[in-house]
Amino acid sequence: MKRFRIVAPLALMSLALAACETTGPGSGNAPIIAHTPAGIEGSWVDPNGIASSFNGGIFETRTTDTNEKLAEGNYLYLSPQLVEINMRSIVRGTTSKVNCALVSPTQLNCTSSAGSRFSLTRRNAG
């Protein structure tokens, strides 16, 4: 009887550990969820097909057909959802400030210091 008291809890513990092992990731039971980057890091596109990238504080805008750089600058977070971009237009030779609000994980609404408004949509990775 004493032996049963030792073996039974060990057997139950083994079953519990085995259950954890077989229901973890990779067992086929967990759904795969696409990960959207946090904040504005990554690639975005405007309705005209102009691509903008935000990477480690560096901002760039390029054409999608020839990859010509149109603007460059830097950005900083004013809050988790609000970003200030200081940019220089290579095409126009001007500098401006743009404030952008992350209204959803895939949409960025922006207003330039001149008052023009535009939206950017996050590009799919891959």
Curated annotation (Swiss-Prot):
Topology in the lipid bilayer: Lipid-anchor
Lipidation (S-diacylglycerol cysteine): C20
Keywords, alphabetical: Cell outer membrane, Lipoprotein, Membrane, Palmitate, Signal
GO cellular component: cell outer membrane
PROSITE patterns for the chain: PROKAR_LIPOPROTEIN (PS51257)
Signal sequence region: 1-19
Subcellular location as annotated: Cell outer membrane
Lipoprotein keyword on record: yes
Primary subcellular site in the record, as a coarse category: membrane
Other facts noted in the record for this chain: Elicits an immune response in B.melitensis-infected sheep but not in B.abortus-infected cattle.
Family under the similarity heading: Belongs to the rhizobiaceae omp10 lipoprotein family.
Stated name of the protein: Outer membrane lipoprotein omp10
UniProt source species: Brucella melitensis biotype 1 (strain ATCC 23456 / CCUG 17765 / NCTC 10094 / 16M)
